[in-house]
């Protein structure tokens, strides 16, 4: 077996499931206020994953109910693997670089990812 054919067995928590290389990733499970989709992963290793896709985020102006979606191209990096309570290795941080300024005023951010599924 070639070294790069080894199953890495590392996941990202996507609200209620552990997923490898998801095409869509919900960042805020409570209200789905931001979703990364059309993700294409260029690498997925035990230490980091790198991908690109599209961010759809609610601008919450004047309120989140009445807000509009802001759509941006993104580059994504998942890092800082940890063990979940259920024993799976999961990434605990996501770095996002946007192609335009977001409603929050940023063009890049680092967020904590959930490390276990919501029951």
PLM regions with names:
Residues 8-50:
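Short, surface-exposed binding/anchoring microloops in extracellular/periplasmic proteins
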Residues 1-8:
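N-terminal low-complexity, Pro/Thr-rich disordered segments
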Residues 50-119:
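Extracytosolic low-complexity repeat regions of secreted or lipid-anchored proteins
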